[in-house]
Amino acid sequence: MAIITRPSNIKRAPLTRPKLNVNPLYDMQNGRMLLGMDGRWYLNGGLAQLNGFGGRGNTWKSTTQRTFHLKAHGRYCRNRGFGENMDSEFSVDPYRSVQLMQNFWEEETFDLMGELENTEGSYNVTDNSEQTGDHWWDCLHGDLNKRAEAKKADKCATPFRDYEGGLIHMLPIWHYDLDSASQLSMASTIKQTEKGTAGSAEQQTIWMRDAGAKAQMITQMAYDLPRGGAFLSMTAHLDDSIKLDTYAPSTKKLAGLKGDLKFKGVPGRQFTFLPSSCYVATAEGNMLDSAKMPEYGISERDAMKGDTDLKIVRYEQLRGKGGPTGIVSDFIYSQQEGMLEHLGCFYYLHKILGGYGMTIKGNSLGFTLDLYPEVYFTRNTIRGLLKTDRKFARAVEITAMMGYERFMWHAEPELYKMEPAVLHKLVKEKGYDWNDILENTIYWWHFNDDFNSINKHTVTHRTLIDMAMGLHEAVYLASYPGKSNGTSS
């Protein structure tokens, strides 16, 4: 009898599971660059199938999660798919979500109110008054199991490669914004709490059962979401744990949790260990300078002393399966407008990287970007420019992603540590038009058959470096040098 040289049961997991790009720096922290079949580099980072966001009150965790999911919907559910916000705290205002999208570019936004008003729309808001958390999950659990049986013909092509050198296909995206898991009510818990007396021993047992039900639910999520082609993020509250024994030492499951902070209303082990990433807000404050003026005013004329519209929140990644654990991220928010993605990129360049990719005039009185040197700006004009000048915002975005790879991706080839000023010079020397690049490209990947509705080419900073070095010819760009003499189309 011949010796068996290989096991009889070998089933390969996908070569990669595409993530949803939702924010330049968040995506870089949670991903890696992958070379596509078309010779372009694509960033596989961002929202994974299961994600967690935690923090105390007023740390913008709900806004962060909602912004990411609205971005995901606009980018990946343009022609298919479904998104839902499960509001367990009865605090969601659809008009606020519309306001959060005012800083999105045209190709990544969508008619949220129109989708909500349409009973067959691609976006929905539900809450605990309409259905309990266990009923909501049980229905989704069943749907995901059915979706897992889909054939390749039902899926959409991505730019990512599979084992055989073909394209990875995905089901139309379903995504869910659960805010919050802490307050998500389970049917059995509701019935039992109605009968009991507040604070009784019986009530304490009920809440232990509630935690057990949520632990089972999150465990199922980690299995069902990848199989069913869905993405889910959930928020949880952090608070100080109460010690019954004041002399007992602190026991922390993860090193990033300071003091005796503890997740409330969720099973800590499942919430922190099963998601691909778990971000926790550790600090929050106003963005005011030493003179109590806004660090970044809306305009030179409108800057007002003591204006606290701008907030900065520092997040720490407690769990990072797609990136380093313990890394911190500073996100910037306007209390009126929501997350300011590109202002956060500039803050990263200016304050964290010490002015990487820019020329600083005087004592930080003004700046020019190496990738867009034509525009001079100050701290009080940058917010307006980021809203009105797409080329400026794109230059900030590219520079921030270059800076992140330069200083954080230590194991990558030295070629991709190129300085922005060198990139600008070499790409221009190759005959490309930087105005075309900044105006008509995006960093995020999209489904291959969505190009006509997006009408922007995916060109990451890595692809730009390959263009600069003559390793990639961007024949798809209007400014491709060969098009002027008819050699390429």
Where in the sequence are the language-model features?
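Intrinsically disordered, low-complexity domain-flanking/linker segments in eukaryotic proteins
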Residues: Y26-Y42, A148-G166, S250-G259
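Terminal-proximal interaction/regulatory segments of ATP-powered molecular machines
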Residues: I360-S489
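Conserved catalytic network of the ASCE P-loop NTPase/AAA+ motor domain
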Residues: L43-G45, G74-N79, R147-A150, G166-M170, ...
